């Protein structure tokens, strides 16, 4: 945190910048205070803490100021945050330690078990981005994958398909769907009705996984769409909030 803030100060005309830090919804008050104090010690003039799905919703262009409820699923690298928002606040939320990095791990394990081939995290991420999907494809995508043969210890190249990657990550995708269902089950019926009307918005890098929006829509029976720029929603929301702070 200290290194990051030093970089900001070096590029800014302000020696003590205002700082907004986004955190998962399941963070404790003690953890929030620790983050805030650390940021203040490193030179923050004023430090604000906001929950990431709220910031993502604002960055996605959702109007959370009205009584009508909105629902956002923010799928980051390490956590997925699911929140129902109304009147500029979070009504109910769930946070699970499963997201984009989990899909990468799933792919590594699948290829290791099926092909006895060891690949790295970077390769797994490339596979996820290029042919990753949670829907069955009639016309499969294929990709060559290079790694180390666990039987011989030598380099080896195999070809994997999009349907294989679907098989690899389906359980993790279903866990995100299950968490979203739990959120909808625990909110007031009136709020659930609002979400049926307005739909669910997906943000974060994980939102780009092919077919995930359709899977959630099919399983939950609620319209689901990916934000226009899912990768930058949190950054854009952070800027909007800071611009409106006094």
Model-derived regions, located:
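Nucleotide/phosphate-binding catalytic cleft detector across ATP-hydrolyzing
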Residues: 1-75, 83-201, 207-246
